Amino acid sequence: MIPVVALVGRPNVGKSTLFNRLTRTRDALVADFPGLTRDRKYGRAFLSGYEFIVVDTGGIDGTEEGIETKMAEQSLAAIEEADVVLFMTDARAGLTAADLSIAQHLRSREKTTFVVANKVDGIDADSACAEFWSLGLGEVYQMAASQGRGVTNMIEYALTPYAEAMGIERQGEEEVVDERQYTEEEAEAEQKRLQDLPIKLAIIGKPNVGKSTLTNRILGEERVVVYDEPGTTRDSIYIPMEREGREYVIIDTAGVRRRSKVHQVIEKFSVIKTLKAVEDANVVLLIIDAREGVAEQDLGLLGFALNAGRALVIAVNKWDGIDQGIKDRVKSELDRRLGFIDFARIHFISALHGTGVGHLFESIEEAYDSATRRVSTSMLTRIMQMSQDDHQPPLVNGRRVKLKYAHVGGYNPPIVVIHGNQVSRLPDSYKRYMMNYFRRSLKVVGTPIQLRFQEGDNPFENKTEKLTMSQERRRKRALSHIKDRKTK
């Protein structure tokens, strides 16, 4: 399970600065999907060998009243569901009453917490940070987030004990940067392994779109409502099921509910819980409310799924009972706002009455099969060559970019690794052209496809050829001639 790191602290202590620095390495993954809305409070990061979710909680002013206000509820929920809390303070401003109040709340929750004294650049850090020991939360870690000082060490301190306890293997940087080149036998074995496993299906969507109703309809039984009790809010509910001879695991992000102050049962919406479900799923089923159309929150959830590279199916729920004019307007909006994910199947359903629900699984299986289909190196290289024949790569400094061969780099999502010369100079427009070419050629449906480009090793790079004696004499004569012309 991917760990969650929550950034907690009063305003203006540098939470957003640290968040941006931690998540910067992941921005490129979203850049391939123009029109996508990014949520600046939640992100995926990779640093010091660990992949993790980082949350900028915000919204806590540190006062007792503020801690209890409704505005802080989402921030407090993020703290509850985080695995590690980084309590950020301002070393320049010193210890404040707000810091003391936040520390008191964190102590009461018994969360794994690390005190971070930020903005230590240009001051006597040891003296400035000494008073933060009085918070009673253990060692104080010094950091200058704006410059990146202390960030890597902090993540190592925070995540290593958690990872060891959970059995999470630490990855080397090279394992993330360089995709593996499968042999034909390894590719076939990996594809068979994935095909034999149950399909993990995460049902996600904003509150009240009908996730629970759809889950009950799929399972054919009414689920027992689960109320919040200690230990029940952390993870989604995993429900095994079998349909037409194929095994599934439904990841129910709507399984945990709570009572509001007026004793109404309302769905508890947790972005963190949704993020974890998406990370663990093979296929994501995004539910959209037909009566509300495509909301910004829908695009944010869609971004999580695309960021994780998951296969995707979209279901527009509550389709029954609305007139044709509204249906036409919704379809037009879907074409306009979701045109950048034309690879995903869209279904119009009624979870309450069961209309169209059966056809969802046809697209779910199709998406998973596309995401785990094995393609040989020779086939990928042939498609790559055909794309070059149809549209040549551009010239870079007078030399044309040369693509040599392609191979499988991974499954779910399917990753194609392309080797060549000057591939780092390829414009994004040509990369998108190649991605669409591979998608059409492979008939990939329901899953994003990722292209990774690797430079061919140049044996003469960073090497200078030693001149012969005659070449050295000619060089000296030429330099002497140039010098004489300048003096004249």
Curated annotation (Swiss-Prot):
Alphabetic keyword roster: GTP-binding, Nucleotide-binding, Repeat, Ribosome biogenesis
GO molecular function, one term: ribosome binding
Ranges for region Disordered: 469-488
PROSITE patterns noted in UniProt: G_ENGA (PS51712)
Binding-site residues, GTP 2: 205-212, 252-256, 317-320
Pfam families: KH_dom-like (PF14714), MMR_HSR1 (PF01926)
Domain EngA-type G, chain residue ranges per copy: 3-166, 199-372
One BP annotation, GO: ribosome biogenesis
Keyword ATP-binding: no
Keyword NADP annotated: no
Domain KH-like, chain residue ranges per copy: 373-457
Binding sites annotated in the UniProt record for GTP 1: 9-16, 56-60, 118-121
InterPro entries, per database record: G_ENGA, GTP-bd, GTPase_Der, KH_dom-like, KH_dom-like_a/b, P-loop_NTPase, Small_GTP-bd
Biased composition (Basic residues): 473-488
Top-rank taxon: Bacteria
Entry similarity comment: Belongs to the TRAFAC class TrmE-Era-EngA-EngB-Septin-like GTPase superfamily. EngA (Der) GTPase family.
Subunit field text: Associates with the 50S ribosomal subunit.
NCBIfam families: GTPase_EngA (TIGR03594), small_GTP (TIGR00231)
Entry-linked HAMAP family: GTPase_Der
Main function: GTPase that plays an essential role in the late steps of ribosome biogenesis.
Protein name: GTPase Der
Species this chain originates from: Shewanella sp. (strain W3-18-1)
